[in-house]
């Protein structure tokens, strides 16, 4: 199924042909005048895949992310005390992922409803805000985890004072403040718009009215909160790998956890973060500067690829729990212990209920005068 959207009206990333205020579509004179005055804009061609691909991905992310991060938060709160510095960062990462997956049911319904948003402008803004808070909060907390592991591997003695839990708490609070302040403009840029067919879109970026300033803002956040952390992470991992090669850490838990950390974080960046930021930037550039008849097919392909990377960007909420399990401090051992304890408690409860049931049956027989037992 292909939906061709009107080129003469703004074509936001989620939808096009929004009705302009005060514009009368039934007036042929006004229509011809506006068409002559308006610059050419490519018609945004929507293929049916986005109505099924994105909700399918979000359903998987919601189920796995909700279960995985719920277990992680439960473990950190009840079974991981006292926390180490890296546990503080991982708890905050799990919290950011959990808050994000809670917003996915509304987004799943939105795409199954043919991108007709019914939850109001405030909920649309909150939806896009939480997505970006999770995106950049996750990147910064992964950077903190990587720097923490780098200090422990490369400078194990010098870093003892710097790796305390108290410092990790202060840094985590600072990360949340930085992310919330940096992402707060999303509350202005995002929002809803009314299409010509009276359905409502929820912009994942912004409308064409604010596109130029949004592009500048997007580039600033991409450089400051994606490119810089990526360079820091790559630097940390390069030095970690070098230390693992030259230091006598064969078969040590620190070596194993460090290798897992490098593999998982680099996989998350390669699959989720890098493609999303590249295609988001290309899509914004296409909307701004590639509006010629010759570029319309290219723009459609960029837009379709960008939609694919939006789904990939949400997968980090599923992958992060694997990080806690493989690279966390004693997480796997304590999870196994907590599971065994819960299993023993369950068996004890079942045995107790069975004994109570047996006693009740015997009591009833005695009351009825049955002496055959």
Curated annotation (Swiss-Prot):
Q: What subcellular locations does the record give?
A: Cell membrane
Tell me which UniProt keywords the record has, alphabetically.
ATP-binding, Cell membrane, Disulfide bond, G-protein coupled receptor, Glycoprotein, Membrane, Nucleotide-binding, Receptor, Transducer, Transmembrane, Transmembrane helix
Gene Ontology cellular component terms for the protein in this record: cilium; plasma membrane
Principal localisation? membrane
Q: Which GO terms describe its molecular function?
A: A1 adenosine receptor binding; ATP binding; G protein-coupled ADP receptor activity; G protein-coupled ATP receptor activity; neurotransmitter receptor activity
State the Gene Ontology BP annotations.
cellular response to ATP; cellular response to purine-containing compound; establishment of localization in cell; monoatomic ion transport; neuronal signal transduction; phospholipase C-activating G protein-coupled receptor signaling pathway; platelet activation; positive regulation of monoatomic ion transport
Q: Coiled coil where?
A: none
Q: Name one Pfam family in it.
A: 7tm_1
Q: Where is the signal peptide?
A: none
Going by the UniProt annotation, this protein carries glycans at 11, 27, 113, 197
Ranges that cross the membrane: 52-74, 88-109, 126-147, 167-188, 215-237, 261-284, 304-325
Assigned protein family: Belongs to the G-protein coupled receptor 1 family.
- Check the record and name the PANTHER family matching this protein: P2Y PURINOCEPTOR 1, PURINOCEPTOR-RELATED G-PROTEIN COUPLED RECEPTOR
Q: What is this protein called?
A: P2Y purinoceptor 1
- Please name the source species: Cavia porcellus (Guinea pig)
Whichever gene encodes this chain, its name is P2RY1
